[in-house]
Amino acid sequence: MIGAAAASLALPAFAETPAHDGASRMTQSNYLAVRPDWLASALEPALEPDLPIVDAHHHFYERPGWIYMLDDYLRDARSGHNIQASVYMQAQTRYRDSGPAELKPVGETAYVAGVTEPLQHGPVAVAKGIVGHADLRLGERVRDVLEAHLEAGRGRFRGVRHLSTWDADPTLANPLSAVPRGLLLDPAYRAGVAQLAPLGLSYDAWLFFPQLPELFDLAKANPETRIIVNHCGGVVRIGSYADKRPEVFERWSASMRTLAQLPNVYVKVGGLGMRINGFDFEKGAKPPSSAQLADAWKPWMMTCIDAFGPGRCMFESNFPVDKGSYSFVNGWNAFKRLTAQASADERDALFRGTVTHAYRLG
């Protein structure tokens, strides 16, 4: 067992940009600017370039000031590591522009499934699994939306993510995905979650760490639903949490260990390159090396792996979101450094096996 082409610049927080129709539209607020020249200043060769990897989490973005689509991801995936497949995560990209509001997210599933279909039998099967958005507050009525996703997904639709990231600190809010307080406890939302397992679908949970007890309650109430926690359980170390970092770690780690008691819960190990994580990698004159990343991440990632075990942990790139902090190659190198003492079977689970099982990638 284990012991204890690049995206364009992101716009400033809460910036408004003119839409094509002349309206003002809120743009992304939470993500760091991607600086290709900065990233290129500290590129490393890929460590263990033959190790098979299935990337458990990435997006396509097509927003004002933030473009990262299939060609961009392929460029990163082919930059040295042996990325054999990936799981695509909803990102409000290519929604339908007409029809019932609840069905508009099906456009993203249809687009991603279509544009990646030619890759499914090649060396990099991008979006071998697809996770889309559905408004789970529809309760039992969400089943029609889920069935539409399944039809659009060309056999690759695997689950739903409906963000639940809420905190009393307004500086943590993302204006593109406003979330009400207590969403995980909402009876209508829970009725929607209950529709997933009968269709063989999983639930991806993106929340902030103070909400982990609410997720425990949701997961315990839905033992047949596979719940996959994103980004190490929502580590937040900025805003009102900036001066409480030891307390944050203790509270987070206790909640994650409690959550790990439920066998239907899995965790994605990664996603610690965001502004909210407070590692401040982006402030360096050069990007962090993989050794620096591994050192900074070790307490958090090893806690996840120790609590859940390799059989319920999977590494993720979270690109392009994390690309504001480090390069694709350096990030995966860091994961390899962190697991250098693990057995071959444990590493295979973390880099390929767990995600393949959790999302039924075959």
Provide a role label for each language-model segment.
Residues 57, 86, 130, 196, ...:
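Conserved, mostly hydrophobic/aromatic
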Residues 52-63, 229-232:
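Histidine-centered catalytic micro-motifs
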